[in-house]
Amino acid sequence: RGLGDVYKRQVMDYVVVEAKGGRLTATIDKSINNLSNADVTVTVPANGSIRALDASSAAKISGDVVLNADKFAMDASSAAKIDVSVKAQSCAVAASSASKINASVEAVSCSVEASSASKITLKGSAAKCTADLSSAAKLSAGDFVAAECSVNTSSAAKAVVNCTERLHADASSGSSIRYSGDCQTSINKSSGGSVGRN
């Protein structure tokens, strides 16, 4: 056994996994404040009961199978990463504080919120999509086809979308929206915001 094996066993002693009210939480014991670069893997079976994912503080969540739900939500913050595939009636995707989400989504409706230099990459499709981006956040959804799409960007945020029917695009404060697809457009630009075809 190498030092790496000993370190992993020691780290596992401080992993706290709790199930409360239908929510599974995996964290490092709050009394420990000197762990750095700890790599802990928690495996959860995808038995059809996963409805939400929440990652923070540089944690990473990845899925090997498509997660099915009527309503699904994912939220990444503080440099966390989420990489999953989802099939749902409605899907909510939120990222903040330099976090990253890479998701394949098949949904009737999809809502996206991103802020503070976070990045969301989507592929798949939805009948309706709404996106709100601010503070240098990025949405890369050129491979995510939405029939109806409403996008609002501000404060140097950037969005790339693919819309086939109706697009409402509102860009302000140095932000930008680029779109593809044969869609009717309603465009508002202010304070250095830009909207254009990709």
Segments predicted by a language model, with ranges:
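An anionic, turn-rich surface loop/hairpin at beta-sheet edges
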Residues: 29-42, 144
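Generic structural motif recognizing short loop/turn segments at the entrances and edges of beta-strands
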Residues: 1, 22-24, 36-40, 191
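Extended, compositionally simple hydrophobic/Ser/Thr-rich segments
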Residues: 42-44, 49-198
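Solvent-exposed adhesion/ligand-recognition segments of exported proteins
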Residues: 9, 14-21, 26
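Short, small-residue-biased leader/transition segments that mark boundaries at the very start
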Residues: 2-7
